[in-house]
């Protein structure tokens, strides 16, 4: 185990992801956190505008053009002597696989909910994934300055739809045009709301230990009475916060505010400092690895191609689990059974990166990837272990890709290989011909790949529909059975980027029949990286 200094570094780190249904305000919350962390001076306008300003966390050209988040941004900043490692996940559901992998690298989630819309479809899916790892969740009800539903109605919906017990920490004073602020339920501090100039941070607090008379005068008799009744009801209905239950993922503390107007963001950050865990252990195939351990371990959860278009580089994002990164450290690339010297790791602020001398558990560092690193790879100071829990998901939509210029075939294979490595798309090579089949979770992924091939690799390509509706990875310990299966079903089989065998079914009926015939073969929807 390490010394007191190492324990201090662990204690001041929080690694968390922001998750939400699209348009709930996730990217806005991210921007306002960066403002409070004093790493940017103004926030972007989130959607493409004529003045050329965009969200800092949306750094890819296509994100700026479309006004959506399609890739994970990693950002590190300090707030009140706490080092925050923030992972802003893709907002669009077509890029959910990237989000799932990111949740394996964090210790806490911040869930953003639109106060008018409440729980939406993607919200449920994200919470189910966080539950796989028992990741604790803090909830922020956003957009209180717009017309919204009653607070207690939203809390009831969270408990019913997400099976999470809510513990309101703050309580809204009305909403929409009448939104007056929030009250901290237990210490009775009131934060009065004033609409700030958009994109400008107001560091002056409106907190007031208001006495009964002045608060009643400010709110008016009716609203004052309503607030008192709601606070009494909340105190009666909802139990007090328990950090133990929170860390187990059984309850979620709930905060209210308006991210666009910088109201309530400081409460989120303070809650993360107070309740979110410092870096926790991770599981390998053989044992747990604790963050206090002396020797370095880490795993790659994301690869990004062409962060720097001038150099065509590929960056591997690594979550440090234990030990300490030091410039020039010798690391074991476990899957490749090779040792490497890492002298140029860096930290991130969305698309920007900065060289670092050292890093600790909970930190996300970037290292250069020359084509040998894959998502899920483990790095150690010599121990032969493998971190688990980073999945690939079977794609749900498929296309065949063609070149407008056949002479670019070599460039196309290279581009698709790199985009596949980072998880932007899945590439399959049929066993019976030389075509290339792309698989994705959603249609938008295909549009993004075509655009990235054009911008980053100077390749013009088009798609055609293909008679495939389902894909399943094939697994069996019996080599004879697999060999027989391949010989009889080659027209439905392909290899993925890792040379894993996959069955491409034209419809559900076909898959059901083949599974019934080969009931001693596993047809799997997910595959461990």
Curated annotation (Swiss-Prot):
GTP binds at residues 20-27, 88-92, 142-145. Its main location: cytoplasm. One of its GO terms (cellular component) is cytosol. It comes from the Bacteria. Keywords: Cytoplasm, GTP-binding, Nucleotide-binding, Protein biosynthesis. It is found in: Cytoplasm. InterPro entries: EF-G-like_DII (IPR053905), EFG_III/V (IPR035647), G_TR_CS (IPR031157), P-loop_NTPase (IPR027417), PrfC (IPR004548), RF3_C (IPR032090), RF3_dom_3_sf (IPR038467), RF3_GTP-bd (IPR041732). One of its GO terms (molecular function) is GTPase activity. Residues 11-280 form the tr-type G domain. GO terms for biological process: regulation of translational termination. Increases the formation of ribosomal termination complexes and stimulates activities of RF-1 and RF-2. It binds guanine nucleotides and has strong preference for UGA stop codons. It may interact directly with the ribosome. The stimulation of RF-1 and RF-2 is significantly reduced by GTP and GDP, but not by GMP. Belongs to the TRAFAC class translation factor GTPase superfamily. Classic translation factor GTPase family. PrfC subfamily. This is Peptide chain release factor 3. It comes from Buchnera aphidicola subsp. Schizaphis graminum (strain Sg).
